[in-house]
A protein has these predicted regions:
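Short, charged, amphipathic alpha-helical segments
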Residues: 38-46, 68-76, 95-104
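Solvent-exposed, amphipathic alpha-helical segments
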Residues: 13-16, 20-30, 74-88, 100-103
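Alpha-helical segments in soluble extracytoplasmic regions
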Residues: 2-59
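C-terminal amphipathic alpha-helix
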Residues: 80-119
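Long, amphipathic, charge-rich alpha-helical segments that form helical bundles/coiled-coils
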Residues: 47-91
């Protein structure tokens, strides 16, 4: 497979998962029943897994060492926030989920901005 095409696919999946995560806010800030909390947690973990794989590929193929380091730091911050969000969803505390979701969304926006091609 063409490496450039693979990276384009990774970036496309990253943007798609990011859009889905950013649109989950309403699902996360309302009081849900037990089954819904479990589904939200599973969906969050699934998206996190896809993002981990694709971000790993994009970062490892980054030609600029500074860019690689910056993306790694932002990705680590994002995954830390998603872990915190996952714990908050498990606790089923809406106020904690709101706070963790906001942190996760901010970290994701920073990561997406850094992924944009340099101009």
């Amino acid at each position: 497979m063409d490496e450039g095409m693979e990276l384009k696919g990774c970036v496309c999946r990253i943007k798609s998962c990011a859009g889905q995560l950013l649109s989950m806010e309403e699902d996360l800030v309302t009081d849900l029943d037990d089954d819904s909390w479990d589904l939200v947690w599973r969906d969050l973990r699934l998206k996190e897994t896809f993002l981990y794989i694709d971000l790993s590929r994009v970062i490892s193929r980054s030609e600029n060492d500074e860019r690689r380091k910056a993306l790694t730091l932002l990705a680590n911050k994002f995954f830390y926030c998603t872990d915190e969000l996952g714990d908050a969803v498990t606790s089923r505390s809406v106020p904690v989920v709101k706070m963790c979701y906001n942190d996760t969304a901010q970290a994701l926006r920073e990561l997406l901005a850094a992924l944009a091609p340099p101009q």
